[in-house]
Amino acid sequence: MAIIDRLSSSQGLRTQDANKALASEILISQNFEAIDELKNLLTNPPDQKVLFDVLKTLEIIGEANPKMIGHLFEEFIPILSHKKNMVVWIAMSALSHITVFHPQRTFELLGTILQIMDEGSVITRDKGFVMLVGLYTEAAYRPDVKALIVEQLLKAPDNQFGQYVEKWMKVISAEDVPALIDTLEQRLPDLTSPSHQKRAHKNLKKLMRA
């Protein structure tokens, strides 16, 4: 059966079950021929439903085994300008799994990524932040990306702030810990939810002990 026939929309399904099953099968069998078929559908989708299914399947594969879709970085980029936000955030999610393989290209695309983060949904912003943190791990880009991460933390919605802080904490260099402490201290007075305040204080204590 052709890959396109395995997709959820081709089977008349509204759930992601078929896409998940296909992704799982490709992962287990390490089927790069199937990846090539998905690539062709990604660049020349017959309709938007197929595009969505292909993106979702590749995103699932990328989350489990980024190397399997690492070579598709450039194919995802044109999709970032798609008119449907759901399509954009799945493309961003897929890209966030493979940023590590393409740091220079990701750095070149920061303007686009930041614009999408500002204009898109919460999920889009989340995936963009993951990309920033991934790029931060590359020493050559760290100073520039550090400033962008701080900027994102200062304007992050309260309910996203804690998880963003913790994502950066996982990879932060010792020399940048003071910058994160300062950012936490700046945001703390503005956090109105007790749970958000508690989380911020907890992270602040961890950083101060580091």
Task: For the regions a language model picked out, list residue spans one by one.
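Amphipathic alpha-helical scaffolding segments comprising HEAT/armadillo-like alpha-solenoid repeats
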Residues: 1-7, 29-42, 66-79, 103-116, ...
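Eukaryotic acidic, Ser/Thr-rich intrinsically disordered low-complexity regions
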Residues: 2-15, 20, 174-210
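Alpha-solenoid helical repeat architecture
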Residues: 7-12, 42-46, 79-83, 117-120, ...
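Alpha-helix N-cap/helix-start positions at coil->helix boundaries
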Residues: 12-17, 32, 47-49, 85-86, ...
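Conserved hydrophobic register position within alpha-solenoid helical repeats
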Residues: 18-22, 54, 91, 128, ...
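Non-membrane alpha-helical segments in proteins
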Residues: 21-22, 49-62, 74, 90-97
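Structural signature of alpha-helical solenoid repeat scaffolds
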Residues: 59, 96, 133-134, 166-171, ...
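Extended alpha-helical scaffolding segments
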Residues: 135-137, 141-142, 146-195
